[in-house]
């Protein structure tokens, strides 16, 4: 049998909804939108790193980072 602790008693309300699932899609479309935006962000960073995205007046010198 599990031992009761003060921390467990404090955290118990956070786990009271365990096993309950909201009907329908819930916030899945919103999560998809944020995942797509994050993908665009990562692609922009990758293009800047590969110098395939040229920004006017913005020089990237990776040797200045000290690696």
From Swiss-Prot:
Annotated compartments: Cellular thylakoid membrane
InterPro entries: PSII_PsbH, PSII_PsbH_sf
TM ranges: 29-49
Keyword set, alphabetical order: Membrane, Photosynthesis, Photosystem II, Thylakoid, Transmembrane, Transmembrane helix
BP GO terms, sorted: photosynthesis; protein stabilization
Alphabetized Pfam families for the sequence: PsbH
GO cellular-component term (any): photosystem II
Single Gene Ontology MF annotation: phosphate ion binding
Membrane topology: Single-pass membrane protein
Similarity comment: Belongs to the PsbH family.
PANTHER family per the UniProt record, alphabetical: PHOTOSYSTEM II REACTION CENTER PROTEIN H (PTHR34469:SF4)
Name this protein carries in UniProt: Photosystem II reaction center protein H
Organism of provenance: Picosynechococcus sp. (strain ATCC 27264 / PCC 7002 / PR-6)
Gene: psbH
């Amino acid at each position: 049998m599990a031992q009761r602790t003060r921390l467990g008693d404090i955290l118990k309300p956070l786990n009271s909804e365990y096993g309950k699932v909201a009907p329908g899609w819930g916030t899945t479309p919103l999560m998809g939108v944020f995942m797509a935006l994050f993908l665009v962000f990562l692609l922009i960073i990758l293009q800047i790193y590969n110098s395939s995205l040229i920004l006017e007046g913005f020089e990237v010198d990776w040797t200045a980072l000290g690696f």
